[in-house]
Amino acid sequence: MGTADSDEMAPEAPQHTHIDVHIHQESALAKLLLTCCSALRPRATQARGSSRLLVASWVMQIVLGILSAVLGGFFYIRDYTLLVTSGAAIWTGAVAVLAGAAAFIYEKRGGTYWALLRTLLTLAAFSTAIAALKLWNEDFRYGYSYYNSACRISSSSDWNTPAPTQSPEEVRRLHLCTSFMDMLKALFRTLQAMLLGVWILLLLASLTPLWLYCWRMFPTKGKRDQKEMLEVSGI
């Protein structure tokens, strides 16, 4: 009986070889899992960096919106021009502040309503920035004709025709008026340059979510295509 039992137990020895093969397959699977995990780590880092960039763009929208409204208030010192009558600096700044605030609220609370409102305000901020830049261009080209003729006031019937003879007081008054108008023109040109920079930055800030979306989609599509190629090749 003992010999028969030993003969029956002998064929079971190759099972150890089967176990060794199974362990080898598990080690290959573990390597594959480690590779996938290492590939996922940069995505988490990229998502963290993109979220920080989004928060920075929202803060920039709020700060630049307030700055746009403040700079636009200074333009009411001058005569009524296109930037003053349109109120471009004020409504552009207001829309930018609302867009940044809505983005922060959606980040904290979520919800379909806040998502829709954030999208609409982002599109409105982009549109108002473009419209403000168009108005800025028109005002910069035609908004200074008043300063060139404001000091040409005389006692003659034609206001644009200087008097034949000017007294020393009239000459001094004309010189002071011209100097004052030159300083005023330089001041408002500086304010216009600052507004131009603010509106360009607002335009870029409103485009940041679109850039981040494209930046996320294109690498993901490339990795998906690479994964499909590896699956087809049998790796």
Swiss-Prot record:
Post-translational modification Phosphoserine, affected residues: 38
Pfam families reported for this sequence: CD20
Predominant cellular place of this UniProt entry's protein: membrane
Transmembrane segments: 55-75, 86-106, 113-133, 193-213
Keywords for this protein: Membrane, Phosphoprotein, Transmembrane, Transmembrane helix
GO cellular component annotations of the record: membrane
Gene Ontology biological-process entries: negative regulation of dendritic cell differentiation
Recorded topology in the membrane: Multi-pass membrane protein
Subcellular location: Membrane
Subunit structure and binding partners: Interacts with MCOLN2.
Family the entry assigns: Belongs to the TMEM176 family.
Official protein name in the record: Transmembrane protein 176A
